[in-house]
Amino acid sequence: RDMKKFLNEVIYIIKDFPKEQRYVVGDRIESTAIDSLHIIARVYMGKDLNMRIADMVELQSNLELLNTLIEIAGEHQWIKGRGKLANLLLLMDSIGRQSTAWKGSLIEALKRSESERSQC
């Protein structure tokens, strides 16, 4: 849900980027956010724990890239208004925490599954 909020915010904020950055940094932010939503859906619907964990690693990599690009955009004042930047950073923090917890629960489920298999 927070990722969807983040994407909605980004779509409007990118419009205010300088033209030369809108099509470089802005497009990268938007496409990475969309890719991240796709990864979340893939993890949610996936069955193979190893694959889901690998997808979570990919998601966390995307989130790190998004966070860095948002910080750069903020430093260059391409994001108009401190409140908008702060909101994006808060959403990124929340998404990061959720993904870390989700990945941790998947790793625990994998350990339990492997433990059950070794006991058989």
Regions found by a protein language model. Give the residues of each.
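Amphipathic alpha-helical assembly/interaction segments
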Residues: 1-120
